[in-house]
Amino acid sequence: MITDLGDKKLTTENDDYWIAPDANIIGSVHLSRDASVWFNCTLRGDNEPIVIGEGSNVQDGSIIHTDPGFKCTVGKFVTIGPVSYTHLTLPTTPYV
């Protein structure tokens, strides 16, 4: 489910991304090229923006949430493994 919160909404660079049908994208979330959000994930950009970098994937059951004043940026080609809870910025190519 994609939920806009006023002017906070999902943005993308193009159509080269994938969101599982039961994932929750809330507020200010940006998906870069070839990014993917898998089953039962929740990305809550209600406080600050979340940016998922090129080729990165957020795997099943993971949650990304922001705190006021702290956006979350996931770099290029990052894998956030299943059932992870993330509040932080991740550089390019790590596995969480």
Model-derived features with residue positions:
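Right-handed parallel beta-helix/beta-solenoid
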Residues: D46-N47, D67-G69
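Glycine-rich nucleotide phosphate-binding loop and flanking beta-alpha elements
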Residues: I25, I64, P94
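N-terminal charged helix/coil linker that caps or initiates catalytic domains
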Residues: I2-K9
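A structural motif detector for beta-strand N-caps
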Residues: T11, D15-I19, A23, V29, ...
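Single conserved hydrophobic/aromatic residue that forms the stacking wall/gate
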Residues: H87-V96
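Residues that scaffold the ATP/ADP-binding catalytic core of kinase and kinase-like folds
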Residues: G61, D67, V96
